[in-house]
Amino acid sequence: MDYLDLGPYSSASGTVRLPGSKSISNRVLLLAALAEGETTITNLLDSDDTRVMLDALGKLGVKLARDGDTCVVTGTRGAFTAKTADLFLGNAGTAVRPLTAALAVNGGDYRVHGVPRMHERPIGDLVDGLRQIGAQIDYELSEGYPPLRIKPATISVDAPIRVRGDVSSQFLTALLMTLPLVKAKDGQAVVEVDGELISKPYVDITIRLMARFGVTVERDGWQRFVVPAGVRYRSPGRIMVEGDASSASYFLAAGALGGGPLRVEGVGRASIQGDVGFANALMQMGANVTMGDDWIDVRGIGHDHGKLEPIDMDFNLIPDAAMTIAVAALFANGTSTLRNIASWRVKETDRIAAMATELRKVGAIVEEGPDYLVVTPPEKLTPNAAIDTYDDHRMAMCFSLVSLGGVPVRINDPKCVGKTFPDYFDRFAALAKA
């Protein structure tokens, strides 16, 4: 097995410019593909998840011209030209869910599949929502999970569409992005969310990006959404992808644990991503954080004892960045509790189980619940722990931070970071110092 040995490091400082946001990159690619006109996307993330989206769009007949982190997309005016396609989407939830919805109303014959873990990640709530408007979608193996067969169908929106919100916000995102393409009574489609909507900031990203492409979604709280139906997305001409706020969390934590000063460029106060809220959680733990419109600075910890304060917080809004808090909790002077993180169970791996297992390897006492994690740090971190990453990019990036505790750590299968941040470890090594 491939592995990477890190540390021991005693400090971290410098400046890092973030790669483009995965969540924004894949949404913008699909919106540009469905729009009228040509869109130039800059700072597009180059990673496994964006590559599978680009490959799929190419197979669907979308004209794409890439040059570095810029991509020019010629829109299809609301309908993909390819009416049959076999689409492999890896383990990219940000690709498989919105594309499934767009394909369901495209009047073609499609197969959607991915890696084995993708076939364990739920999609049933989205399929149920699409079937309410007439979509013809069959499960190939297990009910509620990919692979999917999508067939031509007569689509009509005659009543509010109901969708569960408590498993993944991507089901709602997929419906919102697709409904402008279909005709509806009174020219509008209504989506009603059953249960508590998780990861609300990600839905906010969707709505803001749809507005950039000329479609305004109205919402009543987070339970009812009204979407103009039978309208065209229109290209904004140029759109820049802001830096990935989830990826920022590792460097911000490094600036706290390693003393800083460490500046992250590409996200800040003006960001549309909820994961910039990670900076507030870090401040609650005692880190010295300052923020500009598109940068965040961290300069160590503001306590004489040099340890973070423990945290007890609901992370429903920022589940991805919460993983970084779980590892930062190793450096706190007490027990931390991460609440409302049930969505971790259906991500790239069962992240609650994986995080508990790996935190114990470095000496933590961990209590794992259905939707929470309680982390008590050890007196001293266990050196030379071999961290398994479960083919999960965020596990690999989070646990790099252990090396800032003055102990060496081994990261197994480090290449899994290719999903969102292929050169993460090079960037981390440039900031960390022995």
UniProtKB/Swiss-Prot annotation:
One term under GO cellular component: cytoplasm
Protein keywords: Amino-acid biosynthesis, Aromatic amino acid biosynthesis, Cytoplasm, Transferase
Protein residues bound to 3-phosphoshikimate: 22-23, 27, 168-170, 199, 320, 347
Active site: 320
Residues annotated to bind phosphoenolpyruvate: 22, 93, 121, 170, 351, 394, 419
Localization terms from the record: Cytoplasm
EC number, UniProt record: 2.5.1.19
Main location: cytoplasm
Positions of transmembrane segments: none
The keyword Transferase appears for this protein: yes
Alphabetical list of InterPro entries matching this protein: Enolpyruvate_Tfrase_dom, Enolpyruvate_Tfrase_sf, EPSP_synthase, EPSP_synthase_CS, RNA3'P_cycl/enolpyr_Trfase_a/b
GO BP terms: amino acid biosynthetic process; aromatic amino acid family biosynthetic process; chorismate biosynthetic process
EC category name: transferase
Known catalytic reactions: 3-phosphoshikimate + phosphoenolpyruvate = 5-O-(1-carboxyvinyl)-3-phosphoshikimate + phosphate
One Pfam family hit: EPSP_synthase
GO molecular function, a single term: 3-phosphoshikimate 1-carboxyvinyltransferase activity
Keyword Cytoplasm tagged: yes
Pathway: Metabolic intermediate biosynthesis; chorismate biosynthesis; chorismate from D-erythrose 4-phosphate and phosphoenolpyruvate: step 6/7
NCBIfam families: aroA (TIGR01356)
Family the entry assigns: Belongs to the EPSP synthase family.
Subunit structure: Monomer.
Function: Catalyzes the transfer of the enolpyruvyl moiety of phosphoenolpyruvate (PEP) to the 5-hydroxyl of shikimate-3-phosphate (S3P) to produce enolpyruvyl shikimate-3-phosphate and inorganic phosphate.
Full protein name: 3-phosphoshikimate 1-carboxyvinyltransferase
Organism: Burkholderia cenocepacia (strain HI2424)
UniProt lineage: Bacteria, Pseudomonadati, Pseudomonadota, Betaproteobacteria, Burkholderiales
Record gene name: aroA
